[in-house]
UniProtKB/Swiss-Prot annotation:
Domain F-box, residue spans: 42-97
UniProt feature, compositional bias: Polar residues: 18-28
Stretches for region Disordered: 18-41, 193-212, 248-278
GO molecular function: DNA-binding transcription factor activity; transcription cis-regulatory region binding
Tissue-by-tissue expression: Ubiquitous.
Domain of life (superkingdom): Eukaryota
Protein name per UniProt: Tubby-like F-box protein 7
Transmembrane segments: none
Gene: TULP7
Length: 379
């Protein structure tokens, strides 16, 4: 791929230009094979591992945001050797919540801050697009991450989530999961295309057949595995207040497994203190989130939440999710102030989505999709 190598050559040249005090030029040596001996192999692949590792380390550390982070992806495209080393450095920084490869969309977000995203809605096609925000502006698209399209089938509605904004087939390589609602649109089930743990069984039905999705985890055939539920509470008395919701998510088992998209034991998305978890027989755990209770503003005569400027339009769809705290913990109340996911309206068809650990971009997007649509029994 001459284009990638050309771009990378300029990037490496600039990197060493600004680090001349740390690098030296090696003298010519007879141990270096002549060009004729390298005709059958790439000079990029023949680079010394120490030098190659230093180059990729610098690129990975300095290019921590998109669009500059595409240089890290370029490194992984040079050769197999470059790809292995790049993946090693990318895996070592998983706790940072950086999004580099498609597999990062199913890994937990940052621990100490939120990944800020935008959701764009196309009402005509019932399609929703998730972008990673690159600037504070709500009008900039940012970097495309995922897309979802709503399909109505019989008594339920499905949202097919894909890496490709033009391909929503469950048999596609771009298929990453789906969201299914009941008839009333108050109960939702989240399905992942990859098993959440070893021994997980796909859901029953023809939609659970195994697919050839390879962009998230090439070694694991895709299917439909239940990984979470979102429920909206009924409001039959029509009392004042926003929607009330509870989200129950399945977290990977503590032991590392290949089915967790490269997730290691010290990077599991349940690594948040005092979050209530219910252990399962399969070794995984359920993380329970609930919407943060708003306060009534007497002057404005409306329910209010502090979105810190990330939501500008009042809407029943707006919400913030916090951890359900174990009441046996004496200091547990403090965790209810940490917003793990917030979603809100900033335009007619534009919404913000900010998430952090233990949620992944895929899980956060699925939860936000449940807010679209009318829920007469809950409002």
């Amino acid at each position: 791929m001459p284009l990638s190598r050309s771009l990378l050559s300029r990037r490496i040249s600039n990197s060493f230009r600004f680090h001349q005090g740390e690098t030296t030029t090696a003298p010519e040596s007879e141990s270096i094979p002549p060009p004729s001996n390298m005709a059958g192999s790439s000079s990029w692949s023949a680079m010394l591992p120490e030098l190659l590792g230093e180059i990729i380390r610098r690129v990975e550390e300095t290019e921590d945001r998109w669009p500059q982070r595409r240089d890290v992806v370029t490194c992984a495209c040079v050769s197999k050797k470059w790809r292995e080393i790049t993946h090693d450095f990318a895996r070592s920084s998983l706790n940072s919540g950086k999004i580099t490869f498609p597999s990062c969309l199913k890994l937990p977000g940052p621990r100490d801050f939120s990944n800020q995203c935008l959701i764009k809605r196309n009402k005509k096609t019932s399609t929703f697009y998730l972008y990673l925000a690159l600037t504070p502006s709500f009008t900039d698209k940012g970097k495309f991450l995922l897309a979802a399209r709503r399909f109505r089938t019989g008594a339920y509605t499905e949202y097919i989530i894909s890496l490709d904004a033009d391909d929503f087939s469950q048999g596609s390589n771009a298929y990453v999961g789906k969201l299914r609602s009941d008839f009333l649109g108050t109960n939702f089930t989240v399905y992942d295309s990859q098993p959440p743990h070893n021994g997980a069984k796909p859901s029953n039905g023809k939609a659970s057949r195994r697919f050839a999705s390879k962009q998230i985890s090439p070694q694991v055939p895709a299917g439909n595995f239940e990984v979470g539920h979102v429920s909206y509470k009924f409001n039959l008395l029509k009392s004042r207040g926003p929607r009330r919701m509870v989200s129950t998510l399945r977290c990977p088992s503590p032991s590392p497994s290949s089915s967790s998209a490269g997730l290691s034991s010290d990077q599991k998305p349940c690594d948040v203190t005092k979050i209530m978890k219910k252990p399962n027989k399969d070794g995984s755990s359920l993380t329970i989130l609930k919407n943060k209770a708003p306060r009534w503003h007497e002057h404005l005569q409306c329910w209010c939440l502090n979105f810190h400027g990330r939501v500008t339009v009042a809407s029943v769809k707006n919400f913030q999710l916090v951890a359900t705290v174990d009441q046996s913990q004496p200091s547990g109340k403090g965790d209810e102030e940490t917003v793990l996911l917030q979603f809100g309206k900033v335009g007619d068809d534009t919404f913000t989505m900010d998430y952090r650990q233990p949620l992944s971009a895929f899980q956060a997007f699925a939860i936000c999709l449940t807010s679209f649509g009318t829920k007469l029994a809950c409002e």
